[in-house]
């Protein structure tokens, strides 16, 4: 079977983020359903996030030949499916730890490699990345809403069934042959050494500290919001809709970002994100009333999207190979490592503080206001 390359790419994003829309909001619910404590759930989720960090940092850069991108996606999707199936094999904590690490290690490089494929194809034929990537966000909304509805109708066991189905669909989509194969010169790996990486961190430590705090503050939300809201009386379906609302707000801001932030610097945008973080996590710890939860979820466009846009703007202002290296550090550390570490702490804090964990997240976001890097122009 052959599929037009743009549609092939859109299908890849759709099936990946459909699966991620099941895994990210509801995996803690599945872990709780099989009898694990919040402390253990935090450890498992944290281990998974560390594996995501390592997968993105170590596996994705290994694919230096653009013509091998599709083969790499197929292999990684197959390995991800094998580990998804392995979740069915047992509920012992040691086994779950092993499977969580393997699943996330191979699941995480799929997006950067798909993005690399999109960049390669943009050089070969006209491709509107935004319109293609949008299907990933749409799929996340569908995945989280559908999972919430089915968990309400049945029970937590439907989560693993849907995840397995989603990953299998992703593999089947990747096995379809696109009309145009990726082509391009093999990218030679730069021999930068530790000194270059350390110099990069020293030069950009304020930026990295700021985004690590802002993204890391999402840990309690990613790991325990579904459990917290269900304990407050909301159905799994309602939880799915709330998560979907956050992604809808995210998509809207992505679509309007050029108009909204045209005159803002990365420093200004990081301030906006930090303020949204303090407000969002403070409200989340204070109340579970539905009107306020709607506000909390709309603020996702500030805590996540504006922070990510600020990071992209800051990185784009760097020169030469520094752009590539700083992008790698940002993706691995801010989007992976900081959330992984904070998720482990969030598990302990939720065990003993309950909703108070979200007030701690507000405190985590607060220092970002003062650590922002000095860049120009200002809005």
UniProtKB/Swiss-Prot annotation:
Family under the similarity heading: Belongs to the major facilitator superfamily. Phenyl propionate permease (PPP) (TC 2.A.1.27) family.
GO cellular component: plasma membrane
Keywords: Cell inner membrane, Cell membrane, Membrane, Symport, Transmembrane, Transmembrane helix, Transport
Localization, UniProt: Cell inner membrane
Chief localization: membrane
NCBIfam families in alphabetical order: 2A0127, mfs, PRK11128.1
InterPro entries (UniProt xref): HcaT, HcaT-like, MFS_assoc_dom, MFS_trans_sf
Periplasmic side: 32-37, 97-100, 153-155, 228-231, 287-289, 352-354
SUPFAM superfamilies from the UniProt entry: MFS general substrate transporter
UniProt GO molecular function: lactose binding; lactose:proton symporter activity
Source taxon at top rank: Bacteria
Biological role stated in the UniProt entry: Probable permease involved in the uptake of 3-phenylpropionic acid.
Spans through the membrane: 5-31, 38-66, 71-96, 101-118, 130-152, 156-175, 208-227, 232-256, 267-286, 290-312, 324-351, 355-375
Topology in the lipid bilayer: Multi-pass membrane protein
Cytoplasmic side stretches: 1-4, 67-70, 119-129, 176-207, 257-266, 313-323, 376-379
Protein name in UniProt: Probable 3-phenylpropionic acid transporter
């Amino acid at each position: 079977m052959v599929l037009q390359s743009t549609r092939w790419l859109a299908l890849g994003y759709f099936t990946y983020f459909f699966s991620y829309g099941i895994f990210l909001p509801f995996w803690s619910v599945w872990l709780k359903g099989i009898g694990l404590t919040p402390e253990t759930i935090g450890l498992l989720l944290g281990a998974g996030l560390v594996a995501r960090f390592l997968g993105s940092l170590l596996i994705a850069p290994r694919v230096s030949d653009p013509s091998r991108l599709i083969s790499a996606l197929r292999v990684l999707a197959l390995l991800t499916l094998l580990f998804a199936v392995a979740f069915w094999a047992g509920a012992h904590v040691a086994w779950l730890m092993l499977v969580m690490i393997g699943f996330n290690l191979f699941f995480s490089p799929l997006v950067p490699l798909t993005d690399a494929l999109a960049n390669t194809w943009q050089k070969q034929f006209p491709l509107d990345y935004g319109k293609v990537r949008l299907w990933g966000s749409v799929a996340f909304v569908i995945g989280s809403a559908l999972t919430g509805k089915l968990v309400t109708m049945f029970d937590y066991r439907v989560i693993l069934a849907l995840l397995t189905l989603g990953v299998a669909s992703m593999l089947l989509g990747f096995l379809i042959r696109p009309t145009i194969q990726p082509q391009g010169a093999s990218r030679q790996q730069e021999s930068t050494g530790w000194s270059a990486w350390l110099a990069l961190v020293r030069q950009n430590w304020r930026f990295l500290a700021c985004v690590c705090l802002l993204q890391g503050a999402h840990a309690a939300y990613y790991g325990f919001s579904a459990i917290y809201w269900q304990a407050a009386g909301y159905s799994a379906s309602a939880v799915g809709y709330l998560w979907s609302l956050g992604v809808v707000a995210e998509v809207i801001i992505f679509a309007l970002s050029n108009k909204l932030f045209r005159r803002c610097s990365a420093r200004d945008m990081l301030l906006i994100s930090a303020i949204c973080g303090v407000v969002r996590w403070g409200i989340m710890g204070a109340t579970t009333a539905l009107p306020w939860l709607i506000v909390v979820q709309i603020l996702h466009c500030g805590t996540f999207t504006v922070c990510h846009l600020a990071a992209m703007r800051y990185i784009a202002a760097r020169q030469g190979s520094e752009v590539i290296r700083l992008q790698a550090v940002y993706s691995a550390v801010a989007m992976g490592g900081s959330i992984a570490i904070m998720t482990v702490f969030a598990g302990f804090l939720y065990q003993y503080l309950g909703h108070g964990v979200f007030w701690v997240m507000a405190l985590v976001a607060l220092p970002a206001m003062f650590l922002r890097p000095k860049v120009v122009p200002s809005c």
